[in-house]
Amino acid sequence: MAVRAFPGGHMREILTPPIVFKCLADDTRARMTLLIAREGELCVCELTHALELSQPKISRHLAQLREAGILMDRRKGQWVYYRLHPEVPQWVDAMLKGVVDANQEWLSPDALRLAEMGERPQSPVACA
């Protein structure tokens, strides 16, 4: 098993196809990862609204994606935002963008709920 050091001394497995595909084999994790890849950055409340799932369920799935090294989070006030990890291999980034582009219809119910969400938190990445 190959590992790499992350800031703070944390060690993680290097993202291999089996790790990535195992994480994304779950419908909820696939939907949230693709929405994040599409939008750039989303907070927990936006994902809860878009996917129509409880906050604990969303947070549990986000933790798995973060621990795998696919996503990273940042806190701004009361909001926790998630985005693709900047050190995700290029092949993962390209694959996610390709899947988003090729599956707009599959993502459209979640994307529509997100677009219709009132009082979304302001994110510098989403507004850039």
Swiss-Prot record:
* Entry keyword set: Arsenical resistance, Cytoplasm, DNA-binding, Metal-binding, Metal-thiolate cluster, Transcription, Transcription regulation
Q: Which residues bind arsenite?
A: 43, 45
Main location, first listed in the record: cytoplasm
Q: Which SMART domains match?
A: HTH_ARSR
- NCBIfam families, sorted: HTH_metalloreg, PRK10141.1
Role summary: Binds arsenite and regulates the expression of arsenic efflux pumps. In vitro, also binds antimony and bismuth, but not arsenate.
**What is this protein called in UniProt?**
Arsenic resistance transcriptional regulator ArsR1
Q: Which organism is it from?
A: Pseudomonas putida (strain ATCC 47054 / DSM 6125 / CFBP 8728 / NCIMB 11950 / KT2440)
**Gene3D superfamilies per UniProt:** Winged helix-like DNA-binding domain superfamily/Winged helix DNA-binding domain (1.10.10.10)
Reported uses of this protein in biotechnology and industry: Could be used to construct robust and highly sensitive arsenic biosensors.
Subcellular location per the Swiss-Prot or TrEMBL entry: Cytoplasm
Q: Which GO terms describe its cellular component?
A: cytoplasm
The record's subunit annotation is: Homodimer.
Q: Which residues bind DNA?
A: 44-67
Domain HTH arsR-type intervals: 11-103
Organism classification: Bacteria, Pseudomonadati, Pseudomonadota, Gammaproteobacteria, Pseudomonadales
